[in-house]
Amino acid sequence: MSRVLSAVAWPYANGPRHIGHVAGFGVPSDVFSRYMRMAGHDVLMVSGSDEHGTPILIAADEAGLSPQELADRNHRIIAEDLASLGLTYDLYTRTTTRNHHAVVQELFLGVYENGYFVEQTTYGAISPSTGRTLPDRYIEGTCPICGYDGARGDQCDNCGNQLDPHDLIDPRSKINGETPEFIETQHFFLDLPALAEALGEWLDGREATGLWRPNVIRFSQNILKEIRPRAMTRDIDWGIAVPLDGWRENPTKRLYVWFDAVIGYLSASIEWARRLDEPDRWRDWWNDPDALSYYFMGKDNITFHSQIWPAELLAYSGKGAKGGTPRQYGELNLPTEVVSSEFLTMEGRKFSSSKRVVIYVRDLLSRYQPDAFRYFVAAAGPENQDSDFTWSEFVRRTNDELVAGWGNLVNRTANLIAKNFGEIPKAGELTAADQALLDSVASAFGVVGDLIGRHRQKQAIGEAMRAVAEVNKYVSDTEPWKIKDDPDRLGTILHVVAQCVADLNLILSPFLPFAANEVDRALGGSGEIAPMPRLEEVDDLDGGAPYPIITGEYSGFPAWERRPIVPGTPVSKPTPIFTKLDPSIVDEELARLES
């Protein structure tokens, strides 16, 4: 057994999240975490709402709310949506908690005392019309390195290099198109060059494992070539105060939102332990060098997870060129793997809330089963390359693969048992074909589990559905509905099929947890083999306002292995597991999108 940290990207709370977001970080992390729990590992899955930064200020102004009011509203919406999708967070929290602020300031002080912050005069971008600071990501222009027209003020997505806004050629505000003014300002810069050698050694070690996706390791190594200090404070009044005399009193100096957001993985772990009244338990995942940690995100956040966050951890632990010693948290573990997904587009277009090219999670789940979307992400999502969500493909996969494949197998198995026996029948003498099928399905535990553990979820769901097809073929070949005068043989066939369905239900449960409980119930079980998260209203541990979290009791996961079915277990006629979709919804959804 290993301790496994599933560190899931923090959704930004300037609005509800769309399906492109959860396809990148949400579903893949939950499939992995569910499997790892079933495989016997001690999993801690954490995340939360990222609530600081200028985009929150802008969205709050547009909504006529304070930044805190906007964050409160959107955090609740996001938490409800993620829970409805069945994501099994041990803790989904937020960055405006007092706990998070304290942990971020502790990390800052550790990095500062070890000498990895340098104070520099730089240029800040100001909107001439509003006088408000423009964040790096709200400025775009031409990249001075590759010439790409559309580079952001913090990095160029075309060549991957880090940038500063005043480096851009012809910079302009993404808010109103005006040319920003640049004024001198003081900031703390993370001394990345002093951490470059340690970062490089860590990345080389990760590459040697052969586990990282090639695009992630290559990108991470390439950005080291142009490494330079990066500002970790901002001229803004919404965020976490800089915990130094002369700085904390300044209402317009705050820590960079990306400095604080990635620390959320640690602060959420600490909050989780505190809520258990075991305040040091988080250390089992962060200080134990044998613990494993997997970070899930979209590819636009690789830089922050394979450079900025590891650099912060190395600096706090005193592992860079300047040395140093850690403060109260001790030496902190570096990521075992950065699991980055590519982008999901929709009907050939980039998701864009402003252009209304968007399907919000809440809207999708109000009309369709969550497992239908989870299945689409696993089978056709952006695991290794960009993929496109189309309504026609969503309908096809739901109807042809879930309804006609897995759902049909479950329904006809339970119907045949209910009609002929009313309970799980005993198995008589097995034929070679019976035993071969049982052995083949049992082997899928090893094949599918290995693929999920190596973040090959598309292959994993493919192998599981191949086994479903194999069992469906066995049923068609043996034609149990035609057996009228040999109850022993009929019972044996249905026992074999029921065992295979029970096995496949466990194998598919990380992908299809809602259906897993229905299938278990159809075979006479309790319908509780796939634990679900819950929303809970809690008090801030340090005296702040109450807020909702996602948490859950996940000790009830079954083992990742065959569980022999029990003859005599009552089986009733089931209801369909999946809802067949009318092809007309394609035009309806496209019309809804255009309107």
Curated annotation (Swiss-Prot):
Q: What class of enzyme is it?
A: ligase
Q: Which cofactor does it need?
A: Zn(2+)
Q: Domain of life of the organism in this record?
A: Bacteria
Write down a Pfam family by its short name: tRNA-synt_1g
Motif 'HIGH' region in this chain: 11-21
- Per UniProt, ATP binds at S353
Q: Which InterPro entries match?
A: Anticodon_Met, Met-tRNA_ligase_1, Met-tRNA_synth, Methionyl/Leucyl_tRNA_Synth, MetRS_core, MetRS_Zn, Rossmann-like_a/b/a_fold, tRNAsynth_Ia_anticodon-bd
Q: What is this protein called?
A: Methionine--tRNA ligase
What is the gene name? metG
